[in-house]
Amino acid sequence: MEDAAIREGFAHLRPGREYDRLYDAALCRAGADWLVGINATRLFSVLYGVTLNVGRVMSPTLALLVKREAEIRGFESTPFYVPEISCKGFTASGEKQAEKEAAETICKSCEGQEAVVRTVEKQTKAVQPPRLYDLTTLQRECNRIYGYTAQQTLDYLQALYEKKLATYPRTDSQYLTEDMQGTALSLVRWLRGNMEFGKCCTAEPDIGRVTDGSRVTDHHAVIPTAEITRTDLSILPAGEKDVLTLVAARLLCATDQEHRFEAVTAVLDCGGCSFTAKGKTVLQMGWKEVERLYRLGMKQGKTEEQDREDPALPELRESQAFRPVSASVREGRTSPPRHYTEDSLLAAMETAGVEGLPEGAERKGLGTPATRAAILEKLVAVGFVERKKKQLIPTEKGTNLVTVLPDNIKSPMLTAEWESMLKQVERGEATAEAFMEGIAGMSRELVEQHTTPEERFKGLFPEAESGRREAVGVCPRCGGAVMEGKKGFFCEGRECGFALWKENRFFAAKKKKLTKAAASALLKEGRVSMSGLYSEKTGRTYDAVVMLDDTGGKYVNFKLEFPAKKGRKK
């Protein structure tokens, strides 16, 4: 969106045909979403009598949430006990025990005894700087740090893009192209001099580690633009300022030095048992100092990762003795899996729920960076998922939907395979025709195999039973069921035009409305007795029998019959 970038783009225009495959893939994605959605939503809504929104990506995402909820509910927490000895300046832990008595026995044998260092192992380790943000990783970080939803982050980033302060939002790349190195270097140097959290950086920025044109498809990573150097950030809305500052901090982290530390593991013998003490000594803060200062600036404490870090150990050597030691039992319980947050769910969507994918492996995910936020919002909007603070919890309706859906609709891995094939269409490794034939075949098979609701699932949607309409009567024209609607009583037969309107000219002239009871009597007996009918001619009311006089035309007619023994009211 910067003027210089636009001029640069026009100076290096590429033939439109180079993007034909990208267009084909986008068309396939839209077509597949429509074809699966319109068929599966109508199919399962009709089968179970309640609106059930089904989507090619939405349903597998919901299935991830339902599976996690089942794991949490089915988890049985068990206690554990860890014997520990306290030496001068540090604590060492023994092997975890299932029984408290066993841990207490170990502690009794160690209390007041001598602990001797058997081995000391030291390793120098490094944590490489993080990669730049793509949309999904930025959404995850904003949810983790600020609590923003994925849609809020996208909206803030889109606003920054339109103000020329950030690059294109909807990207799945975490790298820049080689021709951006000069611009990126100038930007990093400006950020180092003007952002408080950047002033700690002293080494030459390593722009090379964030540039790799082969890993950039249609758009590069999200970074600030040069416009940030001419903008007073204090005038930005809070959400936009938060996102832009975070993007700037990530650019500084990604181009800074590695974080290096020495990890120490010491094994001690005491009372015939082994105990282990672990510690960590920072040798070079590197990029983590930028992160620390950034969080300090936003008045945020330590991250969960920092809370779990081992403290530094005193200098230890083999055969070193500590006497006397005190021993105690640390009690704990096993924890269930955590509920998904938007941060962790977006991560799961990237890999279709497969954890621990190695760097560089093809990620067969659910949806695209541009669509994931909207999918999460729709799951909440249709009542399948609810937000409880940062947690995403499937509702009973959402859980029941996943229960009735077949695997080929709700399986994250199968859906991810389709997404992978779309990537192949983009690269010219698969044809759009083959992809759409597969989607059409799956949709056809889905409808053919699910013609009736499964008996075991019929009670899952009680709102369908409570909301199910009862027939008012039988249609005199076609024999179909006549159902009550908002404005009248209508035959369910699609080709039959029979209708009794609640407010029609006949009853309006007599200042009456056609009630459900009256309509039922007309359909069953062809007649209904009514009192208090108004006469336009005399201005008086009277009683009469209303007769159904249907000749098969567009409108149903009525006529009156007067009982011989009843007089008219005055």
Question: Regions from the language model: what does each represent?
Answer:
Residues 197-218, 410-451:
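Leucine-rich, amphipathic alpha-helical/linker segments
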Residues 9, 141, 156, 348, ...:
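Generic alpha-helical secondary-structure signal
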Residues 377, 403, 420, 424, ...:
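Amphipathic alpha-helical coiled-coil/heptad-repeat segments
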Residues 1-350, 357-366, 370-384, 389-391, ...:
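Toprim catalytic domain recognition across nucleic-acid enzymes
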Residues 47-50, 448-570:
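Functional cation/ligand-contacting sites centered on basic and imidazole/sulfhydryl donors
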Residues 372-439:
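Internal insertion modules embedded within essential enzymes
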Residues 17-31, 133, 217-219, 433-449, ...:
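A broadly tuned preference for mixed-charge, low-complexity surface segments
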